[in-house]
From Swiss-Prot:
Belongs to the splicing factor SR family. Extensively phosphorylated on serine residues in the RS domain. Phosphorylated by DYRK1A, probably in the RS domain. Phosphorylation by DYRK1A modulates alternative splice site selection and inhibits the expression of MAPT/Tau exon 10. Residues 264-273, 280-291 have a biased composition (Basic and acidic residues). PROSITE patterns: RRM. Residues 1-72, 110-183 form the RRM domain. The modification N6-acetyllysine is found at K165. There is a cross-link at K182 (Glycyl lysine isopeptide (Lys-Gly) (interchain with G-Cter in SUMO2)). PANTHER family: RNA RECOGNITION MOTIF RRM DOMAIN CONTAINING PROTEIN, SERINE_ARGININE-RICH SPLICING FACTOR 6. It is found in: Nucleus; Nucleus speckle. Plays a role in constitutive splicing and modulates the selection of alternative splice sites. Plays a role in the alternative splicing of MAPT/Tau exon 10. Binds to alternative exons of TNC pre-mRNA and promotes the expression of alternatively spliced TNC. Plays a role in wound healing and in the regulation of keratinocyte differentiation and proliferation via its role in alternative splicing. This is Serine/arginine-rich splicing factor 6. Residues 75-103, 176-344 are annotated as: Disordered. GO terms for cellular component: nuclear speck; nucleoplasm.
């Protein structure tokens, strides 16, 4: 017997309301109400066709209902399904009948784009309308673009059937256009692939950046350590060099001072000798007094300049000998002169 599906029913609808709604379209054999939908069995198939054609989109208890031909074998309220005309039958649970059809949405790859959709048509209307071609798992309307919807089917055959039979049909006064959504699936796949690649690239970049940072830090630390070591070595070397140069320069200065003092003492000694020899013993007493004073003044003037204590010690012995010798000679000369004057 022909059966008709009624969708988007109000939860307050009763069986009497359904009978009134279908009155005038033949005799009703059975009315089966579910949560939000139901089934009506007609006695004549022509009455069922007329009801589907004229009552689809009409209001019932404040809700715009969908009326369409039911698909699949009939199932009773206990879950038993009766076979078709060829016979046969079996048991099917309610999960596979009602809850599977009208359960939570499931995304699949068998997707159709619905264009030229009426603004009055909601996603529930679109889903209920597309059920006549096959099992609809997901429906959406006016989400991404206005007057455009999305329908996803359980299998490829259901999608192909909807594309062949329902393309160009009228929903709420508009002829819809169905387009198979092939590029979007590939685009989404490539997008997910690019996402995973970009994430892996970001992770690898962050790891490489972290490794480069740690390497640069370790290199900078090793450089700073090597610099500090080189600085310490250079400082120790410079200190050693300074101490060596000081120790070397001190003996040089001492040697130079010794040599200078020796040369000065020798020169002064020779000068005093030559001056004392150049004076003649035949001069008068005045000349002797002058020569004594000159020799003393010259010896005093020729005596070395005041020198630091280290230099004075090294220079002092030779000039004392020279002055003592010159004084002794001058005294001997003065004695000899005084003797000669007394004899005269």
């Amino acid at each position: 017997m022909p059966r008709v599906y009624i969708g988007r029913l109000s939860y307050n609808v009763r069986e009497k309301d359904i009978q009134r709604f279908f009155s005038g379209y033949g005799r009703l054999l059975e009315v089966d109400l579910k949560n939000g939908y139901g089934f009506v069995e007609f006695e004549d198939s022509r009455d069922a066709d007329d009801a589907v054609y004229e009552l689809n989109g009409k209001e019932l208890c404040g809700e715009r209902v969908i009326v369409e031909h039911a698909r699949g074998p009939r199932r009773d309220r206990d879950g038993y399904s009766y076979g078709s005309r060829s016979g046969g039958g079996g048991y099917s649970s309610r999960r596979t009948s009602g809850r599977d059809k009208y359960g939570p949405p499931v995304r699949t790859e068998y997707r159709l784009i619905v264009e030229n959709l009426s603004s009055r048509c909601s996603w529930q209307d679109l889903k209920d309308f597309m059920r006549q071609a096959g099992e609809v798992t997901y429906a959406d309307a006016h989400k991404e673009r206005t007057n455009e919807g999305v329908i996803e089917f359980r299998s490829y055959s259901d999608m192909k059937r909807a594309l062949d039979k329902l393309d160009g049909t009228e929903i709420n006064g508009r002829n819809i256009r169905l387009i198979e959504d092939k590029p979007r699936t590939s685009h989404r796949r490539s997008y997910s692939g690019s996402r995973s690649r970009s994430r892996s690239r970001r992770r690898s970049r962050s790891r490489s950046r972290r490794s480069s940072r740690s390497r640069s830090r370790s290199i900078s630390k090793s450089r700073s350590r090597s610099r500090s070591r080189s600085k310490g070595r250079s400082r120790s070397r410079s200190k050693g060099r300074k101490s060596r140069s000081k120790s070397k320069s001190k003996p040089k200065s001492d040697r130079g001072s010794h040599s200078h003092s020796r040369s000065r003492s020798k020169d002064e000694y020779e000068k005093s000798r030559s001056r004392s020899r150049s004076r003649s013993p035949k001069e008068n007493g005045k000349g002797d007094i002058k020569s004594k004073s000159r020799s003393r003044s010259q010896s005093r003037s020729n005596s070395p300049l005041p020198v630091p204590p280290s230099k004075a010690r090294s220079v002092s012995p030779p000039p004392k000998r020279a002055t003592s010798r010159s004084r002794s000679r001058s005294r001997s000369k003065s004695r000899s002169r005084s003797r000669s004057s007394s004899r005269d």
